[in-house]
Every structure is written in C-alpha cells, then in structure tokens.
Amino acid sequence: MNGTEGPYFYVPMVNTSGIVRSPYEYPQYYLVNPAAYAALGAYMFLLILVGFPINFLTLYVTIEHKKLRTPLNYILLNLAVADLFMVFGGFTTTMYTSMHGYFVLGRLGCNIEGFFATLGGEIALWSLVVLAIERWVVVCKPISNFRFGENHAIMGLAFTWLMAMACAAPPLVGWSRYIPEGMQCSCGIDYYTRAEGFNNESFVIYMFVCHFLIPLMVVFFCYGRLLCAVKEAAAAQQESETTQRAEREVTRMVVIMVIAFLICWCPYAGVAWWIFTHQGSDFGPVFMTIPAFFAKSSSIYNPMIYICLNKQFRHCMITTLCCGKNPFEEEEGASTASKTEASSVSSSSVSPA
C-alpha cells in the first residue's frame, strides 16, 4: 500500500519515515508545502466571496419580484439553496481547516462538512436533472397538453431532496464513511480503503451508478432531444431570421450547460473511480484535491448559467441592484421583442425560466 490508513483517515503517503500523523490532530505540512494550504484557503475565500452574494441575491430577487415566483423558478431557488449549503457547510469549513493545515474540527466536524458538501452537490445535481426533464417535456411535448404547474414543481423539489439524502446520509449511519481527502482539509466519501464493517465497495458502486451515471444520461438525453426539437422547428421556418437566431442561442446555452456539468463532476468522479479501482496505488494529495474543488466551484457556475442567461431574471436582478430602475431596460426590451414571432423555440421557452 502506498498510503497510511488509520482510524477514520487515509493519508496518501507511506509512513516509512514515521512522520505521518492523524489529519485530525496534526498539521499535514509534510504532504505539500504550507503555501499550498494558504492558496487553498484563499481559493475557498474567493468561492465564498462570489458564491454567497450571487446565490443570496437569487433568493432575494425572487422573493421581491412576484412575476418570478413561477413553478419552474422553484427549482432555480432550490439550486441557490443547494449552493448556499455548499458555501456555509463546506467552503467555510475548508477555509478554516486550510488555515490550520489539518482537519482541526475533528471527526464530528468531518462528518458535518462531508454531509453538507455532499448534500448541496447532490441537490444541485438532481435539480439540473429536474430542469432537463421539464424542458424536454414542455418543449418536445412527449405528453400532449402537459403544463408544468406548482404541484409538479413541489414534487420535483421533494425528489431532489430525497435523492440527495439517499446519497449524503448513508455514510453517517455506517454505509461507507466520510474521511479527510486530498490535502486532508476537506472531507468526502471513502473511496480509498476497504475498511472492515463499512461496505465501502457497495456504496461507491451505488453512488456512481445512481448518483452520477444515471443523472448524466438523463441530462444528455433530455437536452439532446431538446436540440433536435429546436433544429426541426428552425428547419420548418428557414426564412425566419429570428427563429435561426433563437436556435443558435438555445444551442449555445445547452452546450454551456452540458460542458459546465462535465467540468464540475467528471474530473472528480473520474479520479474517485480510479482511486477506488486502484486502491493501494501511488498518488499524491493534490491528485484528489484539484478535482474535488472543481466540483465545489459549481456553486458559482449554477447561478451564472441558469439565472444570468435568463433575460427576465437578469432584468429583475439589475432592477434590484439599481434601486428599482434598469438602465439597460430599453435595449433588453427591444431584444426580447425581436424574438416574439419565434416564441415556440425562443430561448425564453427553452431556457430554465
């Protein structure tokens, strides 16, 4: 084994020199340069500095503007709540532990940080799935005369929380466990060991299949069908410039959505799966740290993609920030009006709002 396993931790360094210590009790500066811990703390501070205002503003703007309180925007609010979970439950903790160079909050703190970071990430992930399904059903109309209402939105919210809890809660009750990972300043699922009594193998397989592969396939299917529907509608109205413009905008937005999804989750999932299938192999602490924080940065990607690209929401947000007046209102109004005749495939119809 090219690491040191202890009670509730796994340090990716062989303890031949006798310097490896518990990440709950001692600084881990023997793993990487102390400057790396300072850089990690600064990065987490940046995520807090950006992630909290934009997600809080999302909640505030929706509450302030009645026209935004639509059933579909409930899912967008769910994304903001999930991101705030990650900010307060994960980012603040990691910033604090990075300043000390080890997981100073102990085993209980590791469970709390791991749970809230996982819960927030999974709520966000399944919210994206619900958005994808809603867009597919509404735009592609596999079910005739379907209208996404408040009851559907509430069921969607309940579904995201149920699936998120089904992933985040089991490690708290003995099916797998949360342990410090990477530079030992944040906690995640134990992909590293086959510790007796925790059934890590079955949980990791369950998590990858049910909480990564299936959501990924659903998102690709729904947005793939969505693009096909947009192309078919545009082909039927080739003389319409506004339709062609709408097609391009929708295509761009969907591509950004899928790329962001992959950037956030594929590096972390890929590295975690490699570690799981190559337990005992040699790897450094940074190997898991970098992809883990790509996944955490989804708290910034989500509001930028799903809200800032939404014209109505952006208008309301600017109005709120500018004390009730939008200096770009005339320009945005003209842009919106130019798409009226292509309403069946316009970006406002296909974007998540």
Curated annotation (Swiss-Prot):
Chain ranges passing through the membrane: 37-61, 74-96, 111-133, 153-173, 203-224, 253-274, 287-308
Pfam families: 7tm_1 (PF00001), Rhodopsin_N (PF10413)
Modified residues (N6-(retinylidene)lysine): K296
Motif residue range(s): 'Ionic lock' involved in activated form stabilization: 134-136
Compartments where found: Membrane; Cell projection, Cilium, Photoreceptor outer segment
Disulphide bridges, residue numbers: C110-C187
Cellular compartments per GO CC: membrane; photoreceptor disc membrane; plasma membrane
BP-aspect Gene Ontology terms: absorption of visible light; G protein-coupled opsin signaling pathway; visual perception
A GO MF term: G protein-coupled photoreceptor activity
Residue numbers marked as site, Plays an important role in the conformation switch to the active conformation: E113
Topological type in the membrane: Multi-pass membrane protein
Parts of the chain on the Extracellular side: 1-36, 97-110, 174-202, 275-286
Residues that carry a glycan: N2, N15, N200
Cytoplasmic side, ranges: 62-73, 134-152, 225-252, 309-353
Residue numbers with lipid attached (S-palmitoyl cysteine): C322, C323
Keywords: Cell projection, Chromophore, Disulfide bond, G-protein coupled receptor, Glycoprotein, Lipoprotein, Membrane, Palmitate, Phosphoprotein, Photoreceptor protein, Receptor, Retinal protein, Sensory transduction, Transducer, Transmembrane, Transmembrane helix, Vision
Stretches for region Disordered: 331-353
InterPro entries: GPCR_opsins, GPCR_Rhodpsn, GPCR_Rhodpsn_7TM, Opsin, Retinal_BS, Rhodopsin, Rhodopsin_N
Low complexity bias: start-end ranges: 334-353
Cited CDD domains: 7tmA_MWS_opsin (cd15080)
Keyword Membrane appears in the UniProt entry: yes
Modifications after synthesis and translation: Phosphorylated on some or all of the serine and threonine residues present in the C-terminal region.
PANTHER family, sorted: OPSIN
UniProt similarity note: Belongs to the G-protein coupled receptor 1 family. Opsin subfamily.
Function per UniProt: Photoreceptor required for image-forming vision at low light intensity. While most salt water fish species use retinal as chromophore, most freshwater fish use 3-dehydroretinal, or a mixture of retinal and 3-dehydroretinal. Light-induced isomerization of 11-cis to all-trans retinal triggers a conformational change that activates signaling via G-proteins. Subsequent receptor phosphorylation mediates displacement of the bound G-protein alpha subunit by arrestin and terminates signaling.
Name by which UniProt lists this protein: Rhodopsin
